Amino acid sequence: VRAKSFLILLLVMPLTAFANAAIQEFKLDNGLKLIVQEDHRSPVVVSQVWYRAGSLDEVNGKTGVAHVLEHMMFKGTKQVKAGQFSRLIAAAGGKENAFTSTDYTCYFQQLEKSHLPLSFKLEADRMANLQLTDEEFAKEIKVVMEERRWRTDDKPQSKVNEAFQGAVYRAHPYSRPVIGFMNDLENMTADDAREWYNNWYAPNNATLVVVGDVKAEEVYKLAKQHFGKLKPKVLPVRKPQVEPQQIGARRVVVKAPAKLPYLLMGYHVPALTNPDTDWEPYALEVLAGVLSGNPAARLNQRLVRESKLAIDASAGYDLMARGRQSIFALDATPSEGKTVADVEAALIEQIENIKESGVTAEELERVKAGVIAADVYKRDSMFYQGMQIGTIETIGFSWKILEDYPNKLRAVTPEQVQAVAKKYLLKDNLTVATLDPQPIDPNAKPQGKPHVH
């Protein structure tokens, strides 16, 4: 399932960050957007380059190419040899990495503020001058396949998640795993990665987010110095793909060695489209919080603590999606002696209770207070401040919607929460994936291994 809830990301840091921090937005002549959030608590800076290119933009037969290119971006340019990017950042006392999702690919560094020019120099260089050789690709694609084995093939719940995505989405690109299918990775070529890089890696398809002990105007000058000379590209036309309405429940069973069964179920729901007028996504966000937003939420109370049907149970919803499609998901691990059927029935019972009886004002206030209470927490993560800005901008909205997010949540009524449950959490709109545990071979060894750039 995609990120479980944008609410979680907001809880990492206080909402006052956006009310009080100085945020400035710039745009270079080549189309690169720069957003700077000044944070002068410590002499540190976080720099993130976000490309609007993720698995959403891939085509069948080349799944995983966005993530493969992320790996290849560390393989050097004419000026910087393979692996030297990471060594230069480390030598400056910094940290760096990258990640790929359905909607974007992001590269980031965290450094002492005087080293921001190094970050900009390296990122601008590889934005335009990546040397993607057949030799380096042949080595790195094997690393990616190992990562796929480690992330998915070795993990029963990951297998369920992948099967669920393929079942819940039949036409939409969100059906494809970000890491790619193994067959596609085995048949991928360096030319496929080069094509991806040439199509999407351009200043007019990127957002540069800087958070830290800096002055916005100085960062703008530095960005123009390093990124301003890069040429924009004519980007491929993105063809919208809409998932047809589901007209009947779907089920998929995954058999894999595991200790316990597992249940993952979800309903098609809308993602945020118009931040000014949409109310349903905010009501769905609150509904997820009512079910699983805190220890007193319904699923934990009813399924885990009272009936002891499940070891854990949760609900989640991501209102931010560039593909403008989302899933209201629920998952649970049955307690020993209980079945996935027991847990599924209990989850649906909780949903039906909300559809029939609604939610209490107390529950609603508890969920809303969870977000508002984040105001009292000390801001300690520049990285997540950048994450929020970069995610929203890359998805296609303005970071400014964060300022109104708490007000949107406050405005949600019990009637609206009940209304979205009645409208979307329907039997014919349901997809269920379950793990059927098979005996574990005590001599079996993991197939894959993790990767760090």
Provide a role label for each language-model segment.
Residues V1-A3:
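N-terminal secretory signal peptides that target proteins for export/translocation
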Residues S5-A17:
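Bacterial N-terminal signal peptides
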Residues F18-L34, K215-K255, P261, H268, ...:
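Proteolytic maturation boundary segments
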Residues Q37, S42-V68, A82-M127, Q157-N183, ...:
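M16 family metallopeptidases and their MPP-like homologs
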Residues V65-M73, L287:
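Active-site His/Glu-centered metal-binding helix of metallohydrolases
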Residues K75-Q79, M127-E135, R151, E356-T360:
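Short, polar/flexible loop-turn hinges at active-site or ligand-entry regions and domain interfaces
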Residues R149, G166, L235-A296:
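His/Glu-based metal-binding/catalytic segments typifying zinc-dependent metallopeptidases
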